[in-house]
Regions:
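Conserved functional hotspot residues or short segments at active or partner-binding sites
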Residues: 295-393
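Glycine-rich oxoanion-binding loops at beta->alpha junctions
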Residues: 118-146, 159
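Glycine-rich, aromatic-lined ligand/substrate-binding cores of catalytic
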Residues: 248-324
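Conserved anion/nucleotide-ligand pocket segment
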Residues: 205-275
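Glycine-rich, charge-decorated loop segments at or immediately adjacent to ligand/cofactor-binding or catalytic sites
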Residues: 108-114, 183-204
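Glycine/threonine-rich flexible loop motifs
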Residues: 156-168
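Short internal beta-strands
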Residues: 98-104
Length: 410
């Protein structure tokens, strides 16, 4: 099993040389890293090679061209054991980077979920950074004037409501409209080992779900881009001229601990694994731990019955005004839950049962996360998790047949 390690809170990446690690280094690694050590022990024989590392495959395409890059803080790789950003690497190689487009959370990845991101100039390179989150979500024709090629490199987490997919859609659409080639540097999907959840219905589509796919779809972002093209999901059925720089030694059933947290409130493997099941709470009066160090690993609220676990959200980078700020929440700690290989509704169902004011539990935007208006009704009507999941089966089977056409990796 291949692993892509992330050590939280700015601890350095542990480099393995010929799979030999000193006893001291291993002890230090265990001491400083609170993630499960199992993925480390199961580190595979073949190193995962991500798209950004395969410079020999994409450098020839960008020679002597005006380039725009769609990236954020995750767009990094290692050269001589040093972490370097894609933009810095391309500039160092003398390539002509005209501008950078940034998704939700910004180019540096430190803005709150939903926070409006403004255009800026990168202090390090002087390159203009154009925000694709806020009032503007799609590159304009003026933005792309004189641009000959775009590169997309952002780490996704494999959940439909993670907005990097919608940014990908609009970037592809703009490239198609302006006859610009797009190169996607593929990355692993840390939730790529299963497919589950209700398939998005048209009436519930929004920026947190633009396509008829389940909550967890089991594809890399490169495979997903091929599906956007192949299923004619771009405006007027346009096609983007697309090239995917593929991964090597990728096992979609493997565990991937990412070298950078993909957004401020997904700090580790556990939070990423729980995210598809817990994100539904974002449209309820229940906290998922924003404003704590256990984001998407705990749930709770102040007026739940007193429990053995409590937490108090506070203002912090990435969660400037968290739900229930400075209030003690009674809740559940999910950090020791088993690694999920399916979407779990048990916490959402239990949360609704615990709610004293049930008519105010589901907010108006819940159906946009759920992908339909049925899930809310099913929970209100007391259906069990197996009964609800049974209603997804036909749509999931149809999606799996569509998905199969675009898979690059076994």
């Amino acid at each position: 099993m291949i692993c892509y390690f992330y050590i939280s809170y700015n601890l350095e990446f542990l480099m393995l040389k010929n799979f030999q690690v000193s006893k001291y280094s291993l002890i230090q690694f265990i001491k400083i890293n609170f993630f499960l050590i199992v993925p480390f022990i199961l580190f595979g024989q073949n190193k995962l090679i991500v798209g950004i590392e395969k410079t020999d495959l994409y450098f020839p395409y960008i020679e002597n061209k005006n380039i725009a890059v769609v990236s954020n803080h995750t767009s990094k790789f290692y050269i001589n054991n040093k972490k370097i950003h894609l933009v810095d690497s391309l500039i160092n190689q003398g390539y002509n980077i005209q501008k950078v487009f940034a998704p939700e959370h910004g180019f540096r990845g430190n803005s709150d979920a939903g926070e409006k991101i403004i255009n800026s100039i990168d202090a390090k390179t002087g390159i203009p950074i154009i925000s694709l989150y806020g009032s503007k979500k799609k590159p304009s024709n003026a933005d792309l004037e004189n641009i000959e090629l775009m590169i997309f490199d952002i780490q996704d987490v494999g959940a439909r409501f993670y907005t990097y997919l919608s940014t990908l859609h609009y970037v592809m659409e703009s490239c198609a409209e302006n006859n610009i080639d797009l190169i996607i540097l593929d990355r692993p999907n840390p939730n790529g080992h299963y497919i589950d959840g209700p398939v998005m219905e048209k009436e519930s589509m929004s920026f947190v779900g633009m396509h008829p796919v389940p909550v967890v779809y089991g594809m890399t972002i490169g495979e997903y881009a091929l599906m956007i093209n192949g299923e004619n999901w771009l405006n007027n059925g346009q096609k983007c001229k697309l090239k995917v720089i593929e991964l090597s030694n990728y096992d979609r059933m493997g565990k991937y601990i990412l070298p950078e947290k993909p957004s401020p409130n997904l700090p580790n493997l556990k939070s990423i694994n729980l995210y598809p099941s817990l994100c539904f709470f974002e449209q309820t009066p229940v906290s998922v731990g924003r404003g704590t160090l256990n984001q998407f690993q705990v749930i709770g609220k102040p007026n739940w019955n007193k429990s053995n676990y409590q937490f108090k959200p506070i203002s912090m980078p990435g969660a400037k005004s968290p739900k229930f700020e400075n209030q003690t929440c009674n809740g559940i700690n999910l950090k020791n839950e088993k690694y999920l290989s399916e979407l779990s509704l048990k916490w959402l169902i239990q949360g609704y049962k615990n709610e004293k004011n049930k008519e105010k539990f589901f907010k108006s935007g819940f159906h946009k996360l759920a992908g339909n208006k049925k899930l809310e009704k099913q929970i209100k009507n007391g259906l069990s998790e197996p009964e609800i999941k049974k209603s997804w089966v036909d749509d999931l089977n149809k999606f799996k047949k569509i998905r199969e056409k675009y898979l690059i990796y076994n």
